Amino acid sequence: MIPEDPLVEILLRLPVKSLARFLCVSKRCYSIIRSRHFINLYQSRASTRESRVMFAFRDTNTFFRWNFFSLSQPPSSVTNIDSTSYCMPVCVNGLICVEHMFRLWICNPVTKKITLFPDCGPRKQFTTWYMGYDPINYQYKVLYLSREHLIAPYIVEVFTFGDEGSWRMIEADENFHSPETRGVCTHGVLYYGAYTGDGAKIVRFDVRTEKFGKFIEMPAEACSIHGVYLGLYTLLDYQGKLGLLATQATSTYDLWVLEDAEKHEWSKVSIFITREMCPYDLIWPGVVGFVAGSGELIVTARDELGQFHILYVDLKKNRSREVWFEEITPSFGSALVLAFTDYVESIVLM
């Protein structure tokens, strides 16, 4: 019999699909893989592995279905998830969270396992939610905000996935705000744009302590150029930092990167996609993210024939490379596209 320590080390090196098969090999393997200690070790090592990009497409022909594709070798379809909500799906540290039929669901795209979150009480008219990950305690949490009418303050609740408990209400009276943008979770902090009594701000929420920090001021230059309407900005992860992207003109973008949240310090990166970078005459190119590690720009667009393209643009080397999914049809050209740039396999929900 293999001693436990070497066996654990062997199991830690396996991909999630192989671990799922090992659950049926023996009671010993099952006990190890299901243990909290092993799950924490696996999640910790997963964060050090090279991340991949997960794309989500909502086809115009299947408006209520999201199609997820992983940029592996070769690129492949991961899973399809129905969603009747206008809220966008979220992918954090390997798990996908969606809203369907007014309920929240969480899915592991590798194992195809889906589970339903507990109901958080009577449904209110205005709701929004975000998912974050605590890399210290290896916990997934959902932040849920709801209110009865537009002028009422939001009720804020948190649920820790994997716990047998219920939704917990947290204090947020001193941080009254109205969420507006998609969220970005990096290094255990969840960020999103919101309107407050003092205008547009960036909200930060510590996933581990479940506490809101002081609002972050929008970069002054961004407000003077693009205005304070948050719908003009896209929040994204830029090399592990919060990025605020705005379109200057066709193929021209301004990116502000949060350098110090306490001092409200931002740096600016100007982006211009030249004809030399793209081998096609692209129509309505759009930036959807940055590749973790390489910093390549992810651009989606259609050509004059309506064919859909995904390009990785290297701004330093002034060149691009195309990503191709055989499953994507021309109808995706007018679809909504999301990119989750730090996707890693998760052992949770296996």
UniProtKB/Swiss-Prot annotation:
Domain F-box: from-to ranges: 1-45
InterPro entries the record matches: F-box-assoc_dom_typ3 (IPR013187), F-box-assoc_interact_dom (IPR017451), F-box-like_dom_sf (IPR036047), F-box_dom (IPR001810)
CDD domains (UniProt xref): F-box_AtFBW1-like
One Pfam family in the UniProt entry: F-box
NCBIfam families: F_box_assoc_1
Record's protein name: Putative F-box protein At1g19160
Organism: Arabidopsis thaliana
